[in-house]
């Protein structure tokens, strides 16, 4: 079997399947009453994942080394990682919205690798002496998996911002996302359903105003209690359209899964950076040389370290950590692709410069 022809067929097939899968997920979001679309989307992601795994395996057999030595191989490894993390996230959340945001990103990466890169960058070449090391598999694969996880987690955070329309949704629970989201507008909306007569304030403490309304019948007392969070912008609270319970439930799921996936990607990033330092010391005699790639890897680590610190230690929930994660999405792309293509250093692919 001609492995080069097989690889060419598989990379085009991966792109085509991801494109169709993206359309299926978007169609499922537009027509939620068609349940079979969700199953088709999951099947499409799984088939694309298998195609890319086969492509990377064929490249490994052909070249004789782990397929992460050039941009073409790393792009498909990244796409494979994104589809893998997607399948995990979708299985955990059981939400179609995961595919709505991850499928187009995976498709665009595959399209870039297949249709944009020059043919000489797609061909396998003998490894340079510095890359002939077991650290190639250890360092680069872990870094790429961390990028995949962090990107998917950040995409879900962006989806959270879209679902909540940027409103300051408050999570009543732990930072992991076990509580329920309730915006001020939603609390007002639910209070209108529970309270049949104008309530009178009974207490106020630490920025929370408690309102109670009681009605007695047959010796039973029904009490409706509404907690109103005092904000500096009451006009925004009053004018914000209340989110439906379905949106709130979806937002809770997205935030929870986003947090967990970023929590998976961050230790992978840490291990990858440490492995890279050890490899650099063996190859070049220095653990850290402030190469542009190393600098941006550190920036990426700091951004997501701040995200996890804010959630775990500072108790940030909802919109603020989602914005920080969305910023991390851009930083990951700069670290992975921007530095490699535009920068000059030991990690540059040298396409533009």
Swiss-Prot record:
Residue stretches spanning the membrane: 15-35, 37-57, 68-88, 97-117, 142-162, 261-281, 288-308, 322-342
UniProt cross-references to InterPro entries, sorted A to Z: Cyt_c_assembly, Cyt_c_biogenesis_CcsA, Cyt_c_biogenesis_CcsA/CcmC
Family per similarity comment: Belongs to the CcmF/CycK/Ccl1/NrfE/CcsA family.
One Pfam family in the UniProt entry: Cytochrom_C_asm
NCBIfam families assigned to the protein according to its UniProt record, in alphabetical order: cytochr_II_ccsB
Gene Ontology MF terms in the entry: heme binding
Entry superkingdom: Bacteria
Localization, UniProt: Cellular thylakoid membrane
UniProt membrane topology term: Multi-pass membrane protein
One term under GO cellular component: plasma membrane-derived thylakoid membrane
Organism expressing this protein natively: Nostoc punctiforme (strain ATCC 29133 / PCC 73102)
Protein name per UniProt: Cytochrome c biogenesis protein CcsA
Function: Required during biogenesis of c-type cytochromes (cytochrome c6 and cytochrome f) at the step of heme attachment.
Keywords per UniProt: Cytochrome c-type biogenesis, Membrane, Thylakoid, Transmembrane, Transmembrane helix
BP-aspect Gene Ontology terms: cytochrome complex assembly
Self-association and partners: May interact with ccs1.
